Amino acid sequence: QEAIATVINADAPAAMAEACTALDIPFVHISTDYVFDGSGDTARSPKDATAPLGAYGRSKLAGEAAVAAAGGRFAILRTSWVFSAHGNNFVKTMLRLAETRDSLTIVADQIGGPTPAADIAATCLKIADALQSGHGPTGVYHYAGAPDVSWAGFAREIFAQSGREVAVQDIPTYAYPTPAKRPLNSRLDCTELETAFGIPRPDWRAGLSKVLTELGAASS
């Protein structure tokens, strides 16, 4: 499916970025931690070398290159582990499983920053406004929730905040094979975004509380 992924994640952003350049409109493009290979145990900066592990990461990296090549005022925002009250995501999956399970095995050696979709949207607007007014340089930035955590740790917080009594057993990635390889290290260094635009990392635990309230799943 890499050809389809490339159309969606590279060709479409290229067309949008070119249109924005022609109209002198700032363009904010959302990318992913999957452009990295997940090696090491430190946070990756926007300037670190990329090495995607699979088709998704390659298509997103191609999209980044296309947006930059359009030559306009742009910001590429790499983020990770996105969750919200809408669509399919880890939070909603955990809540669904908690309805029928009292214990779960969750990967504990993948580390990253869960990021509320609402905070990503607000950040995109702030960046676009800054670029429109001539403040803030174009380029690649990272934006992810804090503090960094494993999927297992994320699950425990979901169950704690929602009042679900579900035991979480840590397992390694190799015990939970997936069709697409996932990075072990999804930590993103977000200091350049805060320096350029004054936007700090969001506390994902606060974002989780808002999502659970929106879903009607918060602990009473």
Question: Could you tell me what each predicted segment is?
Answer:
Residues 1-28:
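NAD(P)-cofactor binding segment of oxidoreductase domains
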Residues 27-33, 37, 77-79:
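SDR active-site strand-loop-helix element
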Residues 33-53:
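Active-site "gating" loop of Rossmann-like NAD(P)-dependent oxidoreductase/epimerase domains
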Residues 59:
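Active-site helix of classical SDR
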Residues 65-112, 118-119, 125-126:
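NAD(P)-dependent short-chain dehydrogenase/reductase
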Residues 106-111, 139-148, 196:
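Glycine-rich Rossmann NAD(P)(H)-binding loop
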Residues 123-124, 130-179:
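Mid/C-terminal beta-alpha module of Rossmann-like enzyme folds, strongest
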Residues 204-220:
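Amphipathic terminal alpha-helices
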